Amino acid sequence: MNSQDLKKRQEKIRNFSIIAHIDHGKSTLADRILEKTETVSSREMQAQLLDSMDLERERGITIKLNAIELNYTAKDGETYIFHLIDTPGHVDFTYEVSRSLAACEGAILVVDAAQGIEAQTLANVYLALDNDLEILPVINKIDLPAADPERVRHEVEDVIGLDASEAVLASAKAGIGIEEILEQIVEKVPAPTGDVDAPLQALIFDSVYDAYRGVILQVRIVNGIVKPGDKIQMMSNGKTFDVTEVGIFTPKAVGRDFLATGDVGYVAASIKTVADTRVGDTVTLANNPAKEALHGYKQMNPMVFAGIYPIESNKYNDLREALEKLQLNDASLQFEPETSQALGFGFRCGFLGLLHMDVIQERLEREFNIDLIMTAPSVVYHVHTTDEDMIEVSNPSEFPDPTRVAFIEEPYVKAQIMVPQEFVGAVMELSQRKRGDFVTMDYIDDNRVNVIYQIPLAEIVFDFFDKLKSSTRGYASFDYDMSEYRRSQLVKMDILLNGDKVDALSFIVHKEFAYERGKIIVEKLKKIIPRQQFEVPIQAAIGQKIVARSDIKALRKNVLAKCYGGDVSRKRKLLEKQKAGKKRMKAIGSVEVPQEAFLSVLSMDDDTKK
């Protein structure tokens, strides 16, 4: 094709993604669009087709983004090339969403006709507006008995400020309104800008590892053209590779002769090392490089840290390889080696949030067959020492000695909680118990309220989300952004077993709640740790001060069983001998700590402050 033909083809390309809150019907709508454009035959069709990970189907959530090419013949008789880029809806995967939106010109905003706008919808709409996307509102699930499309239309206009007069009323499940959506994409989403004759600039928005072909890049071509045989160069590190294959996904990979400006597809170039390709990097041609890299993504910093250790210590290298492979297409996962006296060798990993941590743990156990122990999650604290230094600490066992600490700052988040009016009291009570500060409250409509609080991230990491769902019968939706660091009265609590500190059980706690949290953990551990041949004291300590203690009683063998009557001094002698043996055993005996003990630091069900 000459450049004139390519420019004509470019005018027919439409790149868009679908954004929605969890369960508002995003994956179902994607399925219908694939059926309507006959991209997938009815034989191959299955629910949530784009959610290819088992985990995604089971949990009914989208974790990874996917990019698919479809052909659509519009009412004007022209055939258009659509690239549908599927995005996750959950707060922990906002990074994935921002990546997929950077590869688009338009976004379909799906809102449930019964539930209306949720906190997550807002967060993703703001991301789309930041990327200057054309937003097409779609009110989905209009066939539900509780649907109220007009109310939702007003919500979209009032809360988000979008013109919803032409919003498509649809039901993805019943296939209503799908054609209107496709026509709106043709009319309203702009064709990609960019120059096919300019030097190649392609944005990497994802990558997968293939055992035979190496790292396969998923790219959006912004300028120029790429074809097999080209020598490409990464703009961040200057490394060069020879392109062996380019193509598109329909969801299956299909090879093509070239990828030109506006296309979304994959590039294979025998890239062997995972570290050479960063998501957000720009690919260009080695013999005709672009002047500057594209504006990539904002690097997401992990907000939650936890230790991951293999239960079998010989699996340490397997765990490292598994983490490297996951990091390849999950750029927000960070890890570094760490050792613990209690757990041996493992990694300190950084995650975007608790769901992200859960998903990574499940993927490690499922896809790589590694049994893991996870320590309690913690956040990044700023510890200011008496020497006027500031240390960032994400691992409680690295906290400096209390005598060296001048003050500690902890991260606060701005939490947006959308909730029906009847539960506002419960939400405010929960937020206050979690040391939250009330900011403001807006009414979205007669019944729904948007409550905003500043809450310490450490409190959200624990079990805030579960508690929020249970106290609002599942009606609340929740989204948070990092806000600032604030000074707090925090202390490090150590747990001692038999007089020895167990580093993996240490945690940071607010001074006010230290005593009760210590008491609960000590009691919990007493139930979990099996009885030994000798008595084991469990203590919770802040610095040198013991704040709570409980003892696991020893198992006792009856050494007097063989004495039938007889002299009391004989019995005493046997008991003294047993006592001496226990004493010796206690001095050298170590206590086995089961996996549940590490998790008990996490779940504080019977905690009064929770």
UniProtKB/Swiss-Prot annotation:
One GO CC term, this protein: plasma membrane
Domain of life: Bacteria
Cross-referenced Pfam families: EFG_C, EFG_III, GTP_EFTU, GTP_EFTU_D2, LepA_C
GO BP, one annotated term: positive regulation of translation
Domain tr-type G, chain residue ranges per copy: 11-193
SMART domains: EFG_C
Xref: InterPro entries: EF-4, EFG_II, EFG_III/V, EFG_V-like, EFTu-like_2, G_TR_CS, LepA_C_sf, LepA_CTD
Location in or out of the cell: Cell membrane
Descriptive protein name: Elongation factor 4
Annotated catalysed reactions: GTP + H2O = GDP + phosphate + H(+)
CDD domains: EF4_II (cd03699), EF4_III (cd16260), LepA (cd01890), lepA_C (cd03709)
Residues involved in GTP binding: D23, H24, G25, K26, S27, T28, N140, K141, I142, D143
